[in-house]
């Protein structure tokens, strides 16, 4: 297990050096209006006033601070990249926003955080970095108070079975083992070095069953959209901020979202 964490941490440390200054993350716009959350996840958020929130796999903290902008009383960001958390702390300080940062792997329960949060949040490109979803869910729910909620919005598993041109099935839908690749550039920084990364595909059942099979967890909502809030491919846009794959419009889901409650 340590090997995959070391390989992927090296990748994300490198990306965290580049992403805060990328056009994709647009630091100038964020300083003017610290809000990067999209309609999919915002539709699931409760009233945040008075809430203590943990953002899992927060990268360098833009979404974390966006939760603060929406009125959260206290925000915490958790990530395994020390470079990312250094950037997150600098971003918060530059905006004079209060936030807390935790250096940890998302699947390893941090005892000091257990039972502390009203809401645990995770968004876009999170679960595929883990070989097994159950430990991730166990950690997320451990951090919630009774009655607290988990909200996840992520790219749909169907998207990950297709080749780079979205023309052919190139990868398994089910988790048949690690997918080892080398990639040059990142989704935000094309100049990123060529580096190895390890990922896993997970069917929807792997994501939902750790919730519905547990007697202290209640799946409140599950939804899918045939559009993405991110333009990460050659796209068409039937509405502002809703991107579909050009030539594949409406054929399959691009994003799923869920809300679950700790009983």
State the predicted function of each range.
Residues 1-26:
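N-terminal, positively charged/glycine-rich alpha-helical extensions of SAM-dependent methyltransferases
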Residues 24-51:
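Conserved alpha-helix/loop element of class I SAM-dependent methyltransferases that forms part
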Residues 52-109:
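Class I SAM-dependent methyltransferase SAM/SAH-binding core
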Residues 134-149:
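A short glycine-rich, Lys/Arg-flanked "PGG" loop and its adjoining helix->strand segment in the class I
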Residues 149-185:
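Conserved class I S-adenosyl-L-methionine
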Residues 154-165, 190-206:
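Acceptor-substrate binding/catalytic loop of class I
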Residues 198-215, 219-223:
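Short alpha-helix
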């Amino acid at each position: 297990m340590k090997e995959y964490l070391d390989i992927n941490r090296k990748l994300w440390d490198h990306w965290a050096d580049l992403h805060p200054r990328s056009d994709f993350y647009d630091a100038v716009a964020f300083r003017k209006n610290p809000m990067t959350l999209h309609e999919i996840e915002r539709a699931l958020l409760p009233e945040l006033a008075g809430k203590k929130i943990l953002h899992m796999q927060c990268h360098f903290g833009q979404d974390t601070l966006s939760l603060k902008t929406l009125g959260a009383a206290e925000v915490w960001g958790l990530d395994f990249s020390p470079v990312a958390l250094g950037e997150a702390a600098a971003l918060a300080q530059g905006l004079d926003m209060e936030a807390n940062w935790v250096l940890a792997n998302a699947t390893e329960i941090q005892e000091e955080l257990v039972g502390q949060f009203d809401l645990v949040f995770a968004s876009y490109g999170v679960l595929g970095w883990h070989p097994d979803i159950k430990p991730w869910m166990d950690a997320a729910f451990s951090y919630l108070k009774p009655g607290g909620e988990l909200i996840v919005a992520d790219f749909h598993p169907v998207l990950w079975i297709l080749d780079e041109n979205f023309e052919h099935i190139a990868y398994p839908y089910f988790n048949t083992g690690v997918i080892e690749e080398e990639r040059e550039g990142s989704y935000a920084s094309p100049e990123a070095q060529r580096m190895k990364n390890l990922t896993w595909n997970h069917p929807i059942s792997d994501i939902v069953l750790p919730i519905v099979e547990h007697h202290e967890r209640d799946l409140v909502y599950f939804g899918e959209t045939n559009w993405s809030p991110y333009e990460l491919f050659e796209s068409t846009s039937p509405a502002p901020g809703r991107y579909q794959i050009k030539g594949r419009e409406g054929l399959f889901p691009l994003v799923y979202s869920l809300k679950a409650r700790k009983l």
